Structure formats: C-alpha cells, structure tokens
Design a protein with these regions (language model features):
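Bergerat-fold GHKL/Histidine-kinase-like ATPase
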Residues: 1-229
Length: 229
C-alpha cells in the first residue's frame, strides 16, 4: 500500500467494512483467487465500483500480495481507499467519506456533514457486494458483516440534492457508528436490498432520523435504476 495512505484515510471521516464467511472455507483461497473473487463480485452502479478494482501500479493506485492476502488501493481525486481479501475469505475495506473529499469539502467546516442519500447508496453497495460473494460461492453459507463509519461526532445529516431538507438537527455525539449483521440463508434469499435496509434503519437511528422503510426502499430502487438525485 502507498505509504501514509491509511493514515490519511483515518484522519478524516471514513467507512470501514469487514466481511467474513459464517463457516470456515473448506480450502483456503489462492492469492490469485482472492483478487478474482473481488473482481467478479464488485458493484458498479453509480460510475465508481465498490470495491474499486484498479489495474495500475503508480502513485494513484496499485495491487500488492502479502503473506495471506491481496490488497488493492486507490489515491485519485476524491477516491482514497483500499481493500484487502484474505485467503480465509475475510474482506476488509477502508474508504474516505466523500463528504470530506469532494470539491466543496474545503468550503465546509471539516467533519460536519453527512449526505443521507450517499449513505443509502454506500450501505446498499456494501451489502450487494457481500451477497454477490455469496452467490458466487465464497460465502455460500452466509456471512458476517460489520459496517462502520468513523468520524461521526458532531456530524449532521443533510438530505441530499433534490430532497426536502430536514426540519431539525439530525446528528450524533458518537465518534463511530457501527452496525453488525449475520446474513444467514434466509437473508441471502431475501436479497441485498433487504439486508441493507436493516443496516440503514439502525444506522440512521443513531442520528435521530427514523424514516419509513418505504422511503429508504424508494431510494434503493432509484439507485439500482441509476436514477440518481
């Protein structure tokens, strides 16, 4: 990984996602298959894939093989992230929060905004990726997932472009918001949208926002149809 990249991500708001199979794999993955599993399951709906699979090897990105994992990283424009797939099937990713890296970030008070629609899209991508790993056979028995957003203390939700603004403050005093789930066979059959919905309901509750599930589903449906606000 590029020197200092993880420290830069940790210095601002960022997502940390961990997934692992519910049951140990019958056979450990080869390093090549670690890369191929991520490559095959990545989610590319809004123009930038999660996890991002890059093929360059320079100051803006690269791939490295460790003793029992493959990792891929990116440091380009607003996209600062890395992922790691272990031979055990455990997946880890760190992604800088777009609210802290976009073109307007320097004009805002650092670490104070969280776009609710972007959260819906991101969490849905995380669960879609996990479900694809399951569908492809890696997590055939289901998987455990931890979705964490670090750097949330004092951060307030904003509704997002084209949405009705919140009438009152929606914020949290917690430094980190983390939601954990075990996705069993019934959850796999219900689909990624339903898995993500449960995570979103719990996540937004930390900010004092408790929308009807139908409102969140509508945003998810628009996401899958690529009708971005």
């Amino acid at each position: 990984m590029k020197e200092g990249l993880l420290e830069r991500i940790r210095a601002i708001g960022h997502w940390r996602v961990v997934m692992r199979p519910r049951s140990p794999l019958a056979e450990r993955l080869t390093l090549q298959r670690c890369f191929e599993e991520v490559e095959r399951a990545r989610v590319s709906i809004r123009g930038w894939d999660y996890p991002h699979v890059g093929y360059r090897n320079d100051e803006q990105g690269g791939t490295e093989r460790g003793g029992d994992f493959v990792e891929n990283w990116c440091d380009w424009n607003t996209q600062i992230e890395f992922w790691r797939m272990h031979r055990s099937g455990q997946f880890l990713s760190y992604s800088a929060l777009y609210d802290d890296t976009d073109a307007l970030a320097e004009q805002r008070e650092p670490g104070r905004q969280l776009n609710a629609v972007d959260v819906i899209y991101s969490v849905t991508e995380f669960l879609e990726f996990g479900h694809r790993l399951a569908q492809n056979g890696l997590y055939a028995d289901g998987f455990q997932i931890s979705v964490g957003l670090i750097g949330t203390q004092g951060r307030r939700l904003v509704a997002g472009r084209g949405r009705m603004p919140f009438m009152d403050d929606k914020s949290t005093a917690a430094a980190k918001v983390e939601v954990e789930r075990i996705i069993e066979m019934a959850g796999l059959e219900a689909g990624a949208t339903e898995s993500a919905l449960g995570v979103l309901v719990e996540f937004f509750d930390h900010f004092g926002w408790n929308p009807a599930e139908g409102q969140l589903r509508a945003e998810q449906d628009a996401f899958y149809r690529r009708q971005f606000g």
